[in-house]
């Protein structure tokens, strides 16, 4: 769901310094997904190329429940998001936001924009670092935070707690039922206008030419600790050494 495509992609520039594997890993490291929303969601997990699919790539998570599972015990990178408004239509599974090709188990497929995205690079560097961040580059569909537990270092909680559906500018609103239903997502400017400037493509594909817009500033003002455009500050990815758990909380 990167920009104008229907895939969620971790910005490659954030991975260049994260490629060395750690020498030892925490054998009890787990990932936990928590649904604090007053409705059911369908979390999805997509690995980057060459890494294994976790939990078959997606599942149902009812309101006020959680699901924990072992983190990979070797270097892994990928992304997690929530699908919302899912049901069966004419015998086919479909989600209003974050849909991954009409299936409950995404099995490595990316999701459709807009969707709030948690990004991870696990087990890298000399101190078994896990790096994590939250991106609104491809829009917003649900509040989401990442909380590390029992790691070494600063290990901050990051993410977007605000419900941007209530304040999303009209031009960015994404509505269900073919655009005639309620607002279920807030699109990025790239998704809304498809321009090279907003999508940071071609001439604009560099830190010097890809700049924040009034639309990305809307996201940044509401959720300052998130990525809001393609060349936003790499410092928004945070490192935590040997955490016991990384917890993704929807509707914190």
From Swiss-Prot:
InterPro entries: Osmotin/thaumatin-like_sf, Thaumatin, Thaumatin_CS. This is Osmotin-like protein. Residues 1-24 form the signal peptide. Coiled coil: none annotated. Keywords: Cell wall, Secreted, Signal. GO terms for cellular component: extracellular region. Pfam families: Thaumatin. GO terms for biological process: defense response.
